[in-house]
Every structure is written in structure tokens, then in C-alpha cells.
């Protein structure tokens, strides 16, 4: 899925803490070459924490002003579209640098949103699993040109998970049989599917680590705040066999045979927080500190519980919500749990008001963000109100309004 959206940003002062001009200029050079040398760049302070940009072109001189690298890149793309009739899209690009720069003025354009989100878990299966750095560089450039400053970054999740499972006593064979082929990894990460078309090779794991370093370095150079993966509670079959006293729940999804479905830890298991902590620590040891961590434990699946026992259901969901949050912050106390809201609409009969309230009840409001995926779906596909309306703006939690303009660019 490909998305855009809302929520948070930096401080303001008379000059930025980091160089925002150089990354923006380098990105623009990748679009128009040496012509970028003729552009004048200036920093301006954010407006009440929100990004701001200006464009001034007069007598052949083009000035781009912005409060961040992304704001300057967005200013450039706005100018190219409106003054030069050029643009960069997923379906093609037409970038022409008109000589001299056409006159144009656009003052004090303030973003209404502090964070603008892009991508979701499934994009990494539909579209990106075999991308190399050259292709990722183009996409990150496009993100900045469109104003994105909060991209999802889940490449190399399995390489980190492998390190964690080794520390938890599994061998490589037990770990590798857990993973799917690359194009199915998004659903593996959400606990929908294991083993299918796997395993992954040593070369794959090594190359994904190297690629993720390139991706994160560029995102951070541009001032973006990537969302990293976190542990969602799903464990390899080898781990289940080693711990027969733990009451794992066997999940079902998509009509796949039982051997391909996931086992999830109970929320009261001490392993949950231990593994979640290790995952965040191993990720940050490899890639550096991060703030936002994505964990999806119930995507398109229902917990195998008695639906008629409402109180037991609410209690279990509250315990899961608290445990997922604690498993992330055990590894980084400053972390924020991010989760997708797709399944709350997709399975609206399971996720009634009280059920979602229960899941969120033990997580601080400022330590969670819900990505309200697919706002074009409730009315036309699920025959419900938009999920954020059904759930009263997610009961005080921060949330991101999102659309699904296409499924991986394939239709």
C-alpha cells in the first residue's frame, strides 16, 4: 500500500541543528544535474512546529526556502509542477529545467501536519522485496519531493530476528524454516504466514542488512523519521517445542494449512517482553537509535477465544496491548508503538468499540500511533463507517489518516 498522512516534528531556533541545505541540494542535483547550482537555498524556521516553505523566482533567479530538507525538496517539486510543467510520479517522470527560471511566487506555505507517512507493511511484498539501492534511492527522492517525512523501513527484519532467535537458543535450521520467501515477508511479519517458499539464504540476510544501512542513512540525512520493525509475539515452531509449558495460541489466516500458520505467545509470558527487548536492542545495535516501532499482532486474524465471553476477551486484549508496548519500551524507553488500523475495519465485527478500547487501555496516549489504513475501504468494501469515526478518533491515541491509492502499483 502507498500512503500519505499525520502527527509530530522538531524544535525551532534561529538556525537548524543539522545541515538541511546540503541533502536537499544533492537530491535536486539528482533530478536536474548541474542546473541545481543556480538555485539559491535558505533555511526558515518552522511555524509552530509545522514545516513551512517558500518559492521565489524572479529575473531568472530561483530561491527555495524551507524549514527542513524535505520542505525544500517539496518546494522544488511544487515549483517544477506549477512553473515548469514538470513532475515526478510512480508511472513516469517529466523533469525539464526551463532556461531561465520562470517567474513565480509562493509565500509561507505551512503544512497542516507534522508527520507525513508513506508505505505500509505490504508494500514490502507487493512491490519492493527485490529492490536494490539504485531503486530505493529513487523512491526516497520521490518521498522527499512529495513531502514525506515518516517512511516505513522494515528491510532486514529477518536478519535482526535471526540474531534474536539464536540468543533464545534456536539453531539456524529452526530459525530459517520459520521465514517465508521475500515476497511473502510482510505477512510473515504480521503472523499470517510462516515457511511458505522459504527459507532465506545467508547472502540474502547479509545483503538486506547492507541495503537497510543505505536506506536509513539517506532517510536520516533528509531529516525523515523512519518507522522500524518490532516483535509482534509470533515465534518459530522450534521455540514452541522447546517450551511445552507455555500456552501458545495457534493462529489461522487465509486458508493456509496449519503448518504455515503462526504461534503467538500469551501476553503473560515473560518471553514476550524478553524477546521484544532483544529485538529492539539488536536493531539499534545495528542501525542506531530510533523512536517509532511498528508491531502488528492481529492483522486479519481473530484470537482463538470464546467470543461469547466478552469480559475474558477484553481482559486478554488489554493484556496484549500492554505487553506489546512494554516489550518495545523495554528495549528503548523513548520508543513509540506504531500499529496499523487496517484490521480494525477489515474485521469490524470482532473489533467493536469495547474490544479496541481494551487493546489501547494500558498504553499511554502519547506513546502510540495508529495508522488508519484504507479510508477509501469502509464505505465501499466493508460497508461500515470510516474506522476513525466508528472508534471516536481512537480514544485519545495519536492516529494517521491514510488512503490506499494502489496495491503495490499492480492495479
Show where each model-derived region lies:
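Short helix/loop capping segments that flank catalytic or ligand/cofactor-binding pockets
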Residues: 72-75, 128-129, 227, 380
Amino acid at each position: 500500500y502507498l500512503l500519505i498522512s499525520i502527527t509530530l516534528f522538531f524544535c525551532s531556533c534561529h538556525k537548524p541543528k543539522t545541515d538541511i541545505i546540503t541533502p536537499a541540494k544533492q537530491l535536486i542535483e539528482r533530478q536536474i544535474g548541474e542546473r541545481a547550482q543556480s538555485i539559491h537555498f535558505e533555511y526558515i524556521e518552522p511555524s509552530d512546529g509545522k514545516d513551512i516553505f517558500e518559492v521565489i523566482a524572479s529575473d531568472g533567479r530561483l530561491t527555495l526556502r524551507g524549514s527542513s530538507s524535505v520542505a525544500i525538496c517539496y518546494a522544488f517539486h511544487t515549483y517544477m509542477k506549477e512553473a515548469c510543467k514538470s513532475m515526478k510520479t510512480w508511472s513516469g517522470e517529466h523533469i525539464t529545467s526551463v532556461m531561465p527560471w520562470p517567474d513565480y511566487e509562493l509565500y509561507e506555505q505551512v503544512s497542516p501536519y507534522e508527520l507525513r507517512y508513506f508505505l505500509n507493511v505490504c508494500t514490502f511484498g507487493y512491490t519492493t522485496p527485490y529492490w536494490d539501492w539504485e531503486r530505493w534511492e529513487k523512491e526516497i527522492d520521490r518521498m522527499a519531493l512529495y513531502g514525506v517525512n515518516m517512511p516505513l523501513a522494515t528491510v532486514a527484519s529477518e536478519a535482526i530476528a535471526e540474531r534474536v532467535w539464536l540468543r533464545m537458543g534456536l539453531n539456524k535450521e529452526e530459525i530459517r524454516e520459520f521465514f517465508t520467501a521475500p515476497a511473502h515477508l510482510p505477512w510473515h511479519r504480521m503472523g499470517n504466514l510462516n515457511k511458505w517458499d522459504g527459507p532465506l539464504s545467508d547472502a540474502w540476510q547479509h545483503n538486506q542488512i547492507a541495503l537497510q544501512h543505505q536506506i536509513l542513512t539517506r532517510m536520516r540525512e533528509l531529516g525523515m523519521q523512519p518507522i522500524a520493525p518490532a516483535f509482534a509475539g509470533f515465534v518459530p515452531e522450534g521455540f514452541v517445542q522447546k517450551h511445552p509449558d507455555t500456552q501458545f495460541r495457534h493462529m489461522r489466516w487465509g486458508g493456509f494449512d496449519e503448518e504455515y500458520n503462526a504461534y503467538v505467545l500469551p501476553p503473560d509470558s515473560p518471553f514476550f517482553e524478553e524477546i521484544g527487548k532483544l529485538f529492539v536492542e539488536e536493531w539499534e545495535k545495528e542501525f542506531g537509535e530510533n523512536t517509532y516501532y511498528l508491531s502488528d499482532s492481529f492483522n486479519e486474524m481473530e484470537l482463538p477465544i470464546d467470543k461469547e465471553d466478552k469480559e475474558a476477551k477484553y481482559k486478554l486484549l488489554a493484556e496484549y496491548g500492554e505487553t506489546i508496548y512494554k516489550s518495545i519500551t523495554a528495549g528503548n524507553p523513548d520508543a513509540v508503538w506504531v500499529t496499523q488500523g487496517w484490521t480494525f475495519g477489515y474485521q469490524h465485527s470482532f473489533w467493536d468499540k469495547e474490544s479496541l478500547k481494551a487493546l489501547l487501555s494500558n498504553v499511554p496516549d502519547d506513546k502510540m500511533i495508529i495508522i488508519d489504513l484504507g479510508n477509501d475501504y469502509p464505505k465501499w468494501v466493508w460497508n461500515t463507517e470510516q474506522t476513525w469515526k466508528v472508534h471516536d478518533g481512537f480514544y485519545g491515541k495519536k492516529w494517521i489518516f491514510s488512503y490506499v491509492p494502489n496495491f503495490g502499483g499492480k492495479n
